[in-house]
Protein backbone atom coordinates (compact mmCIF):
# COMPACT_ATOMS: atom_id res chain seq x y z
CA UNK A 1 0.00 0.00 0.00
CA UNK A 2 1.32 3.40 -0.92
CA UNK A 3 2.58 5.53 1.98
CA UNK A 4 -0.03 8.24 1.78
CA UNK A 5 -2.02 9.52 4.72
CA UNK A 6 -3.80 6.26 5.47
CA UNK A 7 -7.19 6.22 7.20
CA UNK A 8 -7.36 3.36 9.69
CA UNK A 9 -10.28 2.48 11.93
CA UNK A 10 -9.86 0.49 15.14
CA UNK A 11 -13.29 -1.08 15.62
CA UNK A 12 -14.61 -2.59 18.82
CA UNK A 13 -17.81 -4.48 19.45
CA UNK A 14 -18.04 -3.53 23.12
CA UNK A 15 -17.86 0.19 23.69
CA UNK A 16 -14.88 2.40 23.06
CA UNK A 17 -12.29 1.28 25.62
CA UNK A 18 -10.76 -1.55 23.61
CA UNK A 19 -10.80 0.37 20.34
CA UNK A 20 -8.97 3.26 22.04
CA UNK A 21 -6.23 0.88 23.22
CA UNK A 22 -5.96 -0.60 19.71
CA UNK A 23 -5.81 2.93 18.24
CA UNK A 24 -2.80 3.79 20.41
CA UNK A 25 -1.01 0.55 19.45
CA UNK A 26 -1.77 1.03 15.73
CA UNK A 27 -0.49 4.63 15.77
CA UNK A 28 2.78 3.45 17.34
CA UNK A 29 3.17 0.56 14.89
CA UNK A 30 2.45 2.70 11.83
CA UNK A 31 5.03 5.25 12.95
CA UNK A 32 7.59 2.44 13.46
CA UNK A 33 6.84 1.15 9.95
CA UNK A 34 7.27 4.63 8.47
CA UNK A 35 3.62 5.23 7.54
CA UNK A 36 1.54 8.33 8.08
CA UNK A 37 -1.91 7.39 9.31
CA UNK A 38 -5.03 8.92 10.81
CA UNK A 39 -6.32 6.29 13.24
CA UNK A 40 -9.83 6.47 14.66
CA UNK A 41 -11.35 4.44 17.50
CA UNK A 42 -14.97 3.60 16.67
CA UNK A 43 -17.74 1.23 17.70
CA UNK A 44 -18.92 -1.41 15.23
CA UNK A 45 -22.07 0.63 14.58
CA UNK A 46 -20.04 3.71 13.64
CA UNK A 47 -17.63 1.66 11.53
CA UNK A 48 -20.33 0.07 9.37
CA UNK A 49 -20.95 3.32 7.50
CA UNK A 50 -17.24 3.91 6.88
CA UNK A 51 -16.22 0.66 5.16
CA UNK A 52 -15.83 2.46 1.83
CA UNK A 53 -14.00 5.53 3.12
CA UNK A 54 -11.30 3.92 5.29
CA UNK A 55 -8.16 2.25 3.94
CA UNK A 56 -7.91 -0.34 6.74
CA UNK A 57 -10.28 -1.53 9.47
CA UNK A 58 -8.73 -3.51 12.30
CA UNK A 59 -10.84 -5.43 14.80
CA UNK A 60 -11.12 -8.70 16.63
CA UNK A 61 -10.98 -11.65 14.25
CA UNK A 62 -14.42 -12.61 15.60
CA UNK A 63 -15.95 -9.42 14.14
CA UNK A 64 -14.46 -9.50 10.64
CA UNK A 65 -17.39 -11.44 9.17
CA UNK A 66 -19.67 -8.50 10.00
CA UNK A 67 -17.96 -6.28 7.44
CA UNK A 68 -18.89 -6.03 3.77
CA UNK A 69 -16.43 -8.26 1.85
CA UNK A 70 -16.69 -5.86 -1.11
CA UNK A 71 -15.75 -2.81 0.95
CA UNK A 72 -12.89 -0.56 -0.14
CA UNK A 73 -11.22 -0.97 3.26
CA UNK A 74 -8.89 -3.89 3.86
CA UNK A 75 -10.29 -5.79 6.84
CA UNK A 76 -7.70 -6.94 9.38
CA UNK A 77 -8.70 -9.39 12.09
CA UNK A 78 -6.54 -9.98 15.14
CA UNK A 79 -7.03 -12.75 17.70
CA UNK A 80 -5.29 -10.97 20.60
CA UNK A 81 -5.86 -7.24 20.32
CA UNK A 82 -3.43 -6.54 23.15
CA UNK A 83 -0.54 -8.30 21.38
CA UNK A 84 1.43 -5.58 19.62
CA UNK A 85 3.45 -8.10 17.57
CA UNK A 86 0.29 -9.77 16.25
CA UNK A 87 -1.17 -6.40 15.28
CA UNK A 88 2.09 -5.44 13.54
CA UNK A 89 2.19 -8.72 11.57
CA UNK A 90 -1.47 -8.40 10.56
CA UNK A 91 -1.04 -4.80 9.38
CA UNK A 92 2.18 -5.62 7.52
CA UNK A 93 0.25 -8.13 5.39
CA UNK A 94 -2.05 -5.42 3.99
CA UNK A 95 0.40 -2.52 3.68
Swiss-Prot record:
InterPro entries: PTS_EIIB-like_sf, PTS_EIIB_2, PTS_EIIB_2/3. The active site is at residue 12. PROSITE patterns: PTS_EIIB_TYPE_2 (PS51099). It catalyses: N(pros)-phospho-L-histidyl-[protein] + L-ascorbate(out) = L-ascorbate 6-phosphate(in) + L-histidyl-[protein]. CDD domains: PTS_IIB_ascorbate (cd05563). It holds the Pfam family PTS_IIB. GO terms for molecular function: kinase activity; protein-N(PI)-phosphohistidine-sugar phosphotransferase activity. It is found in: Cytoplasm. Keywords: Cytoplasm, Kinase, Phosphoprotein, Phosphotransferase system, Transferase, Transport. GO terms for biological process: phosphoenolpyruvate-dependent sugar phosphotransferase system. Its EC number is 2.7.1.194. This is Ascorbate-specific PTS system EIIB component.
Amino acid sequence: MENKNLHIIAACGNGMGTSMLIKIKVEKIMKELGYTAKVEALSMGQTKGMEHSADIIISSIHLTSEFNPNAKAKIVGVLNLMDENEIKQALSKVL
